[in-house]
């Protein structure tokens, strides 16, 4: 995506290009999914760290404030789904942190911006999640997931992400009904 910006003070125009990852165009990312306690599976791609985690799946419908959500201690240990379709476009702004670290266990978005644009930004969301060992999942229909959580209530879930032995065993279990039942019991 390319956007033209007009700087009022300098009376100049500059062009900024953004690389945006969408669910269907992420060849360089690893396979990932979320498995809900009710057995539903939403497949997508990995960003941030990779591995296998469990937690309570919740959602937030905020159009901005992803930095505040990630650093809010009230989300401690939860898998948070962000319904707004593009996350990360204004980067990381330490002044906006609610605390000194990320508190969510997992983070789910429709798409994320690799090259944020903000004069205050200090990095991108993918690098930040990796640095704090937080698993991210992108490329899924976050609104469909939110509808399930809204109608059924919050429920436990598991994110499976990457190519580790643990992740590959969990992906294999999803294809076998008896192994899937064992996997669901771990949630």
Predicted regions, residues:
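Polybasic, lysine-rich low-complexity intrinsically disordered segments
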Residues: 10-12, 16-17
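RNA-binding accessory domains that recognize and position tRNA/RNA substrates
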Residues: 27-187
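Residue-level detector of alpha-helix boundary/anchor positions
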Residues: 1-2, 132
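N-terminal intrinsically disordered, low-complexity tails enriched in polar/charged
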Residues: 10, 23-28
């Amino acid at each position: 995506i390319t956007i033209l910006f007009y700087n009022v003070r300098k009376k100049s125009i500059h062009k900024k290009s953004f690389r945006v990852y969408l669910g269907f165009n992420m060849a360089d990312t690893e396979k990932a999914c979320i498995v809900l306690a009710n057995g539903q599976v939403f497949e997508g791609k990995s960003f941030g760290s990779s591995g296998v985690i469990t937690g309570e799946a919740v959602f937030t419908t905020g159009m901005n404030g992803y930095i505040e959500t990630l650093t809010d201690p009230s989300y401690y240990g939860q898998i948070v789904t962000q319904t707004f379709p593009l996350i990360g476009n204004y980067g990381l702004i330490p002044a906006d942190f609610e605390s000194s670290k990320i508190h969510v266990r997992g983070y789910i978005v429709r798409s994320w911006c690799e090259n944020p644009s903000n004069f205050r930004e200090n990095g991108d969301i993918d690098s930040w999640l990796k640095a704090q060992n937080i698993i991210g999942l992108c490329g899924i229909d976050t609104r469909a997931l939110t509808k399930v959580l809204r109608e059924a209530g919050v429920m436990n879930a598991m994110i499976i992400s990457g190519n580790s032995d643990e992740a590959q065993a969990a992906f294999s279990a999803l294809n076998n009904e008896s192994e899937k039942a064992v996997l669901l019991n771990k949630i």
